[in-house]
Amino acid sequence: MASVMQKLITPLASGPAEPPRNKVTIVGVGQVGMACAVSVLLRELADELALVDVVEDRLKGEMLDLQHGSLFLKTPKIVADKDYSVTANSRIVVVTAGVRQQEGESRLNLVQRNVNIFKHIIPQIVKYSPDCILVVVSNPVDVLTYVTWKLSGLPKHRVIGSGTNLDSARFRYIMAEKLGIHASSFNGYILGEHGDTSVPVWSGANVAGVSLQKLNPDIGTDKDAENWKEAHKMVVDSAYEVIKLKGYTNWAIGLSVADLTETLVKNLNRVHPVSTMVKGMYGINEEVYLSLPCVLNSSGVGSVINMTLTDGEIGQLKSSADTLWGIQKDLKDL
């Protein structure tokens, strides 16, 4: 006797189901991982979302919670497992796993604790999705993106750190608030390390093509009577402030990662300040990952924009690179 399903549906296509075309995997279902997952889902960027974590109950709970919202989403398949086979055929893999930054702890203090975790994670990802683009979010993100590149064996253009995409977004928000305009109408970049040695590019800051440095040649310096450099200090302090108030940061980084994911999946060729291999640029001679304005597309980092930086800004970038190299050179087992 025919089942309800057999009576209801007449199949036409035969053979195996089509593999996913825009599968996104999130490794780590903590606060940041789930903010990334929800942001990707709400922007309708994936035809399959996979979640991976070592804490099985939490992982299953998050999967079920998202699946129960399927009616309100456009992602037909949401899966989760601690086994990395669930991530197979991913286009984008977002790595948020790692130990969390503590209040007052600098991002660079986190590094060796997270390196040991990555030695398990990264080879598993590449085993099941050898053609993926890896987006590293875990802190300290620049060093861990370098670690990911070394452990993965992937070409450098397919290993990206979320870098200063969020720092730049914070900068644009803070500056725009001071100017009474929307964040998208203030153009400015934070480059270098995602963290304490980040570099504000005051020479390029503008609104509608009007250079702020031309209006105020001292902008961003100690001589500036208007003290605009306070905006960059607020960017550097912002994560620490949010962590102090609520224990972690997650929503802004989740939105930032979804923004990057959209550019990669849709082959948009948009420019984002993300962490990439900078050896040979701006006089940097070491293999370090730092944020520069990168053209992102379906290949990963398609190219890097050569910004016209001042000597002071280039000096700050080199200093940022030196800070990171000081950590990297002591890493073990890479």
Swiss-Prot record:
EC top class, as a word: oxidoreductase
InterPro entries from the UniProt entry: L-lactate/malate_DH, L-lactate_DH, L-lactate_DH_AS, Lactate/malate_DH_C, Lactate/malate_DH_N, Lactate_DH/Glyco_Ohase_4_C, NAD(P)-bd_dom_sf
An example Gene Ontology biological process? lactate metabolic process
Q: Key word Cytoplasm present in the record?
A: yes
| Species lineage | Eukaryota, Metazoa, Chordata, Craniata, Vertebrata
The UniProt family comment states: Belongs to the LDH/MDH superfamily. LDH family.
The subunit field of the Swiss-Prot or TrEMBL record says: Homotetramer.
This protein's source sits in the domain of life called: Eukaryota
- Classification via Pfam families: Ldh_1_C, Ldh_1_N
Residues engaged in binding substrate: R107, N139, R170, T249
Task: Specify the pathway.
Answer: Fermentation; pyruvate fermentation to lactate; (S)-lactate from pyruvate: step 1/1
Q: Which Gene3D superfamilies match?
A: Lactate dehydrogenase/glycoside hydrolase, family 4, C-terminal, NAD(P)-binding Rossmann-like Domain
- Could you give one GO CC term from the UniProt record? mitochondrion
Q: What is this protein called?
A: L-lactate dehydrogenase B-A chain
Q: Cite the GO molecular-function annotations of the record.
A: L-lactate dehydrogenase activity
Can you state which reaction this protein catalyses?
A: (S)-lactate + NAD(+) = pyruvate + NADH + H(+)
Which annotated residues bind NAD(+)? Answer: 30-58, 100, 139
